[in-house]
């Protein structure tokens, strides 16, 4: 190996392109090219930095923080004031990812004026690049107002967790006669100006049909393999969630077990007087 190669001047490998900030236009381009991409939730600086380093292009600061950060049973109780500090941390930790902030229940349903005030606050106070809200035709006016104001909107149809009480629990949406309404919802949010749409717990065949109909990217969670992108709650994805998880979850690691092992070893070494050792002392 030559000295030039060691210092990078004459390497046979192509020079890696510097990473660029992901924009909504990239997602549109990827759909046109048939390039699938991954989205993960994130709720703090350190996790966001790890996911950004891993090349995850889109991070969602979801109202799922209600469950995995604050310990609520559903996403309904979480407030704007509880979400905003989390979004700030994620934005600071992920210089390359597109960061999307969830609008919590009760912060946009009254109409376009309320939705605009809430979304504006999120963008101004956190640095988020886009917002997400739940609903199809019923929130089309809110989406149109935000889009007209220059605020990128990710829509969310199918099973909408904020409506869990009205939907009668965690149930697949869009089966049978309800499929037509799900299609109408997808078209409505696209026409209103959404740059992408999450489809949650929708039959795979229906999600495939909708993905083919839309020009904006679809993001699946429990919606089969043919969406343009996929999203998971990171604690589910990494194996930190304890107990039973949804059918659509695949565990790609066992972070929970490793955390328990490390914490147990730390406690044992402190109790035994092994830690801190000389090399950890000044």
From Swiss-Prot:
<comment type="pathway">
    <text>Cofactor biosynthesis; (R)-pantothenate biosynthesis; (R)-pantoate from 3-methyl-2-oxobutanoate: step 1/2.</text>
</comment>
<feature type="binding site">
    <location>
        <position position="63"/>
    </location>
    <ligand>
        <name>Mg(2+)</name>
    </ligand>
</feature>
<feature type="binding site">
    <location>
        <position position="134"/>
    </location>
    <ligand>
        <name>Mg(2+)</name>
    </ligand>
</feature>
<keyword id="KW-0963">Cytoplasm</keyword>
<keyword id="KW-0460">Magnesium</keyword>
<comment type="subunit">
    <text>Homodecamer; pentamer of dimers.</text>
</comment>
<feature type="binding site">
    <location>
        <position position="102"/>
    </location>
    <ligand>
        <name>3-methyl-2-oxobutanoate</name>
    </ligand>
</feature>
<dbReference type="GO" id="GO:0015940">
    <property type="term" value="P:pantothenate biosynthetic process"/>
</dbReference>
<comment type="function">
    <text>Catalyzes the reversible reaction in which hydroxymethyl group from 5,10-methylenetetrahydrofolate is transferred onto alpha-ketoisovalerate to form ketopantoate.</text>
</comment>
<dbReference type="GO" id="GO:0000287">
    <property type="term" value="F:magnesium ion binding"/>
</dbReference>
<feature type="binding site">
    <location>
        <begin position="63"/>
        <end position="64"/>
    </location>
    <ligand>
        <name>3-methyl-2-oxobutanoate</name>
    </ligand>
</feature>
<dbReference type="InterPro" id="IPR040442">
    <property type="entry name" value="Pyrv_kinase-like_dom_sf"/>
</dbReference>
<dbReference type="InterPro" id="IPR003700">
    <property type="entry name" value="Pantoate_hydroxy_MeTrfase"/>
</dbReference>
<dbReference type="Pfam" id="PF02548">
    <property type="entry name" value="Pantoate_transf"/>
</dbReference>
<dbReference type="GO" id="GO:0005737">
    <property type="term" value="C:cytoplasm"/>
</dbReference>
<feature type="binding site">
    <location>
        <position position="132"/>
    </location>
    <ligand>
        <name>3-methyl-2-oxobutanoate</name>
    </ligand>
</feature>
<comment type="similarity">
    <text>Belongs to the PanB family.</text>
</comment>
<feature type="binding site">
    <location>
        <position position="102"/>
    </location>
    <ligand>
        <name>Mg(2+)</name>
    </ligand>
</feature>
<dbReference type="GO" id="GO:0003864">
    <property type="term" value="F:3-methyl-2-oxobutanoate hydroxymethyltransferase activity"/>
</dbReference>
<keyword id="KW-0808">Transferase</keyword>
<feature type="active site" description="Proton acceptor">
    <location>
        <position position="200"/>
    </location>
</feature>
<keyword id="KW-0479">Metal-binding</keyword>
<keyword id="KW-0566">Pantothenate biosynthesis</keyword>
<protein>
    <recommendedName>
        <fullName>3-methyl-2-oxobutanoate hydroxymethyltransferase</fullName>
        <ecNumber>2.1.2.11</ecNumber>
    </recommendedName>
</protein>
<dbReference type="InterPro" id="IPR015813">
    <property type="entry name" value="Pyrv/PenolPyrv_kinase-like_dom"/>
</dbReference>
